[in-house]
């Protein structure tokens, strides 16, 4: 098992009212791949410890990593990371973890990236890695969320021509799409044509992931080419 490493918070950036991005400097960080995640451990003064897993939001950059954390109700770890941890303070990190939900833009083929809510975090790592590598492999991003107030990486994604936003409860003024759940027809219209080279990556809450995965298979994507990452109330 990978050892725990000390990680110092060096910068923070608000994403929404309930989420922020943490930039951490990790001692002896070995590097990571787009789509991987880490385990975070907090230790209280009385010795009580709590652990949670969080996706990495950016590609490898020396000893720096980024995590985007959304506060969940009664979340003892997410609440502290969003509201309590201050620049200069330390937590413990273990990882990187995961080898299945990984897309390397320099090595792998085209990708359809589908995110629900905070499931955009590992997808963002993939997009940033693609931009950094300067490769032109076809990519489409479909990002489903409740309302504009839940949108992560607002400015960065606004400049992405390959992005389709699907709001389920409230849409911004002027949005031509009325609020509704993401449909199979939209996966077809805004995705990529199924092919042996294409891999689909789906990340979000369990119900969303199951629904989207089934829809992708129903429109012709090979089940083996649909990779998923899901989380629950006490997850990432």
Predicted regions and their residues:
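FNR/FR-type flavoprotein reductase catalytic core
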Residues: 73-236
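Ferredoxin-reductase
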Residues: 2-89, 145-147, 167-170
């Amino acid at each position: 098992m990978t050892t725990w490493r000390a990680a110092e918070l060096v910068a923070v950036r608000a994403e929404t009212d309930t989420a922020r991005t943490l930039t951490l400097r990790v001692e002896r960080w070995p590097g990571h791949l787009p789509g991987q995640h880490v385990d975070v451990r907090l230790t209280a003064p009385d010795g009580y410890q709590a652990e949670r897993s969080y996706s990495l939001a950016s590609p490898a950059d020396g000893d720096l990593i980024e995590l985007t954390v959304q506060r969940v109700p009664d979340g003892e770890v997410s609440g502290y990371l969003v509201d309590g941890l201050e620049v200069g303070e330390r937590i413990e990190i273990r990882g990187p973890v995961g080898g299945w939900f990984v897309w390397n833009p320099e090595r792998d083929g085209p990708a359809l990236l589908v995110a629900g809510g905070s499931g955009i975090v590992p997808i963002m790592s993939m997009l940033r890695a693609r931009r950094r590598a300067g490769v032109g492999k076809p990519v489409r991003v479909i990002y489903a969320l409740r309302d504009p107030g839940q949108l992560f990486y607002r400015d960065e994604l606004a400049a992405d021509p390959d992005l389709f936003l699907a709001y389920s409860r409230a849409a911004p003024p002027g949005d031509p799409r009325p609020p509704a759940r993401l449909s199979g027809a939209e996966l077809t219209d805004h995705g990529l044509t199924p092919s042996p080279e294409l891999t689909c990556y789906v990340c979000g809450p369990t119900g969303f992931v199951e629904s989207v995965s089934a829809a992708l298979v129903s429109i012709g994507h090979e089940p083996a080419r649909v990779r998923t990452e899901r989380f629950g109330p006490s997850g990432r």
